[in-house]
Amino acid sequence: MGARSKARKRALDILYAAEMRGEEPATALDRAIAAGEGPTNDYTSDLVRGVVEHRPRIDELLADYSEGWTLDRMPAVDRNVLRLGVFELMWADDVPDAVAVTEAVALVQDLSTDESPGFVNGVLGAVLRNKDALTR
């Protein structure tokens, strides 16, 4: 697993744990860093802070492109992987779009339901197809 793949997994861990605790992700990140358990890769922090900064727009896009699913109905892992994927597609200009989608699908393949890879691929694919028309 490459450095950025590990950073994505660690960012997912932080986002997921924060959601389960009812904590803000940035607070969870800062707490982990202060406790010496923080990410060793700056990209993890970039991902968590990016998702936090753009979360209203990310969640709006997910609501628009997750046909038949509300954010609340999605498994928490899928929801947070999708947030990471949309962030990378829309705001991480140094990440190729195909890599953002592939990495998101790989995360849910390992950590979520059997249906999750197809769902995540479909949602991110729809965002990607419409990316040029979407406002950041």
Question: What are the residue ranges of the model-derived segments?
Answer:
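N-terminal interaction/assembly modules
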Residues: M1-R136
